[in-house]
Amino acid sequence: MFPHRFFSVLLFFLLFLAPARSADVEYVWRGVDYQWGSLSNWSVGGIAASSAPGAAASAYEHWMVTNGTDSAGRTDVGGLGAGGRYLKGVRIEGLNSQPEGKIPLFIKNTNKDVYLRVEEGGITVENAGEGGYSADFGVAQLRVAADQEWHVAEGRSLYVGHDDDAPSGGLYSLTSEGDVPRRVTVTGGGAVRIGEGM
């Protein structure tokens, strides 16, 4: 009986001393003018964001989430400064349909030192609900920062790197953070397209 009580107290003591991990933060991107750097395009908990998500100081605590109604467009991470964005994960949950089969949301890049880094939260591409939303997603320069899952729902697409529909004049690559081998598990009935030369 004594050893059991001793280890119970020890476990409680260690849990008490363990540093508290800050909660993940969901940044909702509205995409009205398609610029990451415009804080008017971001909200946190329904209020305006004070900074764009995924800075190095808050590495892998932020999620990029769409709001399902106003996120169609194209944005450039290249103006964010060297190092890029550190995201826990990305959830594309329904976007305005775009004519002529264009990718509703494409994160392009014009700066070779800037990457979109995605950690264990991975990438999810799916419709927010029934109806006229088309939740396709493309990303130019992606660094996989942990083992993760990419879930692409039936009828949806995830484009990584250069593709016929990708914007011209951008940089395209798919790499692993620190060149460490990573495992990416792909689920769902949708399509994942990796560009040429990846």
For the regions a protein language model found, what residue spans apply to each?
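N-terminal leader/targeting segments and the first structural element of proteins
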Residues: 169, 196-197
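Short helix-onset patch at the extreme N-terminus, typifying the N->h transition
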Residues: 6-9, 31
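Extended, compositionally simple hydrophobic/Ser/Thr-rich segments
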Residues: 160, 194-196
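N-terminal secretory signal peptides that target proteins for export/translocation
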Residues: 1-4
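Solvent-exposed adhesion/ligand-recognition segments of exported proteins
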Residues: 18-156, 161-180, 187
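Bacterial N-terminal signal peptides
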Residues: 8-18
